[in-house]
């Protein structure tokens, strides 16, 4: 079944079951670590797993195959491990700090492919993904809409994919140049942050400041476009 947390924010039985299974495994394998998960799990700890059991729930609820789990291990605002999965494409993305970012099949049985962002350095050649806050009446939403229009004019093209996690994976894999998102929470981002960074990308807020787990406006890029995007995204 589907529950509506708000007019546009949904949760399915699958979210809840996935969270239960992920939490069970993490508690068993790393009992000393904390866990924060989107659907309510909260165990304290110095090192904390941040879990979105199904990033892209709206997509999933419409049978739109662009969604998957996102898991990051954090020490404060530092991400130590990141894992994302796309069950519909049999793709597993993963990174450990200082060891690069990789993609493999879901069972990790093939030869891992090292990930690297693109070197595109002009906006009109760049493909973007975007994310919006749930509250369509908020100023944050209206500002993001203005930024979306600017990006549409200046870029090769822009998408609104419905999954922050897989958008981050696509930046790391060189499939898109940037993900620009407003209203995203830590559980949306934690699994993919390190994967992008280890693939050579850059992550800040819209003003170019370092991110924290409390950041709500995210600029993720291949790095070469970053300064140009900070200027483009400014709103007086």
Where are these regions (language model features)?
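Acidic beta-strand-loop-alpha-helix segment within the catalytic core
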Residues: 72-167, 215-236
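Short secondary-structure boundary segments
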Residues: 38-39, 132, 182-184, 207-209
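Residue-level signal for inorganic ion chemistry
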Residues: 15, 26, 57, 86, ...
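Glycine-rich active-site/cofactor-binding loop and its immediate structural neighborhood
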Residues: 48-89
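N-terminal subdomain of lithium-sensitive/metallo-dependent phosphomonoesterases centered on the IMPase/IPPase/PAP
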Residues: 1-54, 231-234
């Amino acid at each position: 079944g589907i529950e509506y947390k708000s007019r546009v924010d949904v949760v399915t039985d699958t979210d809840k079951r996935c969270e239960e299974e992920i939490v069970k495994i993490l508690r068993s394998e790393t009992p000393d670590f904390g866990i924060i998960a989107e659907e309510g799990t909260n165990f304290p700890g110095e090192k904390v797993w941040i879990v979105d059991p199904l990033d892209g729930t709206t997509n999933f609820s419409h049978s739109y195959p662009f969604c998957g789990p996102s898991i990051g291990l954090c020490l404060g605002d530092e991400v130590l491990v990141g894992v994302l999965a796309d069950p519909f494409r049999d793709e597993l993305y993963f990174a450990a700090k200082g060891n690069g970012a990789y993609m493999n099949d879901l069972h990790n049985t093939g030869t891992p492919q090292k990930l690297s962002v693109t070197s595109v350095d002009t906006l009109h050649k760049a493909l973007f993904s975007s994310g919006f806050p749930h509250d369509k009446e908020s100023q944050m939403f209206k500002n993001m809409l203005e930024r979306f229009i600017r990006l549409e004019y200046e870029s090769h093209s822009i998408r609104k994919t419905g999954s922050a996690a897989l958008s981050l994976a696509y930046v790391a894999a060189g499939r898109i140049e940037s993900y620009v998102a407003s209203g995203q929470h830590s559980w949306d981002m934690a699994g993919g942050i390190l994967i992008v960074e280890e693939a050579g990308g850059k992550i800040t807020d819209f003003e170019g400041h370092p991110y924290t787990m409390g950041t709500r406006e995210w600029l993720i890029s291949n790095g070469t476009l970053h300064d140009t995007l900070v200027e483009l995204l400014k709103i007086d």
